[in-house]
């Protein structure tokens, strides 16, 4: 259904991947995995036509509809929730809206009637059963939007709920080919379960990027691994890929070690007997073997393990945080109502709940970024807290280097300490001098962890 031919993508001298020739079949759901910056999102954008390849081409079977999950939560602020979903089929959306305008015309001329007939044909082609409104209503209700809210503007929704609408937008038309870049971001647990069920029943072709191993195991039939500037396909789930790739790496190590040992033995024989007349013929034979021997090398993977170390600067007491009678409302809508809890030394707490219920609001209040309507936030006297915000990729921006960005976070820190924190998150040497605004989303998340460690 989708095929790449000699695909290559490079940014200047830096090659992300090259010589990519893969075929994505109907009925298969591919998980696209790889290290931060390896080129996953770039490859997905090339597949979906959002970005050009440096070389090669992408071929999509004629007549197949492609759906791509939008990453811009603010693109439909002036649309109703219902219309934002309907825009998943833009041809149908435009025809319906034009029909509505024409029906408001003061006069039904022949020209108007002819155009209405043309629009009716388009609607019939795109929605033969005339059930688009039923389908959209059902999918929105499944995602937690009651029917009464479907005419609300997108601008009234939280970030998490906007993302749910974008999911509905790409899933509602049932495209033959589905491209999803991190679809579980900002979703609550219940919605992730719903999405898993929807994707398991997708009978076309799907490519999804996710860092959620459990999600990949639940929805994928195949794995596409971006590494070594190549994209390799594996059958099975993420766990199947992990087992197979580990075995391949071990086998490669064994093969290289075996050839290296053979090379050393040949070199020793040649050095020992090349000057010996009786052994000269054998030495010459060994030299020919050595010349033909290709030891090769262990391929350098783009995957590297970070070293995340959170060190306390001083000892803390028993009570770290006390929250007393905290309440918060937005436009009359109560989000937090008289919240009370205590965090003690050693606690590890998960904050869960549906989208829009107030989890991020509570975190922002604790951090001091949002003011509560009432109540108290009492931090322990020796506490120094850190915060990883939901919008980390938006917070980390600017035309400055990674080093300068982290330096601005703590002007009192030693130069070596700053470079150490960057190095632990795999930003070494010249990488520390690259611009923040050139970083991928995953790299910005690593930057935020560097800040927290600092």
Residue ranges and their predicted role:
Residues 1-256, 305, 309-454:
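ABC ATP-binding cassette signature C-motif
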Residues 244-297:
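Intracellular alpha-helical coupling/juxtamembrane segments of multi-pass membrane proteins
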Residues 285, 303-305:
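Short Gly/Ser/Thr- and Asp/Glu-enriched loop/turn motifs at secondary-structure junctions
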């Amino acid at each position: 259904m989708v095929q790449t031919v000699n695909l290559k993508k490079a940014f200047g001298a830096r090659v992300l991947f090259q010589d990519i020739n893969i075929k994505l079949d109907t009925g298969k759901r591919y998980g696209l995995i790889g290290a931060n910056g390896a080129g996953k999102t770039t490859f997905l954008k090339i597949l979906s036509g959002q970005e050009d390849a440096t070389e090669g081409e992408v071929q999509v079977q004629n007549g197949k509809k492609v759906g791509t999950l939008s990453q811009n939560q603010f693109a439909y602020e002036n649309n109703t929730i219902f219309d934002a979903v309907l825009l998943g089929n833009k041809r149908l959306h435009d025809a319906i809206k034009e029909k509505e305008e024409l029906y408001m015309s003061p006069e039904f001329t022949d020209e108007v009637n002819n155009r209405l007939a043309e629009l009716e044909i388009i609607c019939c082609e795109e929605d033969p059963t005339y059930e688009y409104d039923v389908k959209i209503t059902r999918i929105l209700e499944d995602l937690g939007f009651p029917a009464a809210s479907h005419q609300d503007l997108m601008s009234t929704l939280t970030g998490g709920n906007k993302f749910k609408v974008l999911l509905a937008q790409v899933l509602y038309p049932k495209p033959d080919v589905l491209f999803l870049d991190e679809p579980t971001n900002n979703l609550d647990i219940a919605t992730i379960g719903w999405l898993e069920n929807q994707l398991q029943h997708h009978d076309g072709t799907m490519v999804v990027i996710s860092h959620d191993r459990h999600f990949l195991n639940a929805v994928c039939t195949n794995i596409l691994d971006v590494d070594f500037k190549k994209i390799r396909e594996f059958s099975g789930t993420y766990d199947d890929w992990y087992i197979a790739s580990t075995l391949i790496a071990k086998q490669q190590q064994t093969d290289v070690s075996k050839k290296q040992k053979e090379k050393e033995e040949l070199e020793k024989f040649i050095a020992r007997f090349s000057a010996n007349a009786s052994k000269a013929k054998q030495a010459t034979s060994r030299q020919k073997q050595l010349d033909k021997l290709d030891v090769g090398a262990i391929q350098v993977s783009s995957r590297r393990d970070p070293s995340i170390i959170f060190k306390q600067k001083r000892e803390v007491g028993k009570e770290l945080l006390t929250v007393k009678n905290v309440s918060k409302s937005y436009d009359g809508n109560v989000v937090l109502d008289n919240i009370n809890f205590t965090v003690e030394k050693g606690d590890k707490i998960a904050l869960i709940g549906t989208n829009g219920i107030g989890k991020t609001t509570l975190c922002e209040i604790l951090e001091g970024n949002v003011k509560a309507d009432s109540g108290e936030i009492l931090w322990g006297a020796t506490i120094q807290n850190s915060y990883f915000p939901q919008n980390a990729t938006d917070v980390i921006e600017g035309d400055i280097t990674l080093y300068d960005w982290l330096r601005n976070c703590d002007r009192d820190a030693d130069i070596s300490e700053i470079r150490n924190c960057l190095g632990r998150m795999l930003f070494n040497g010249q990488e520390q001098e690259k611009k923040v605004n050139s970083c991928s989303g995953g790299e910005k998340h690593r930057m935020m962890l560097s800040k927290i460690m600092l």
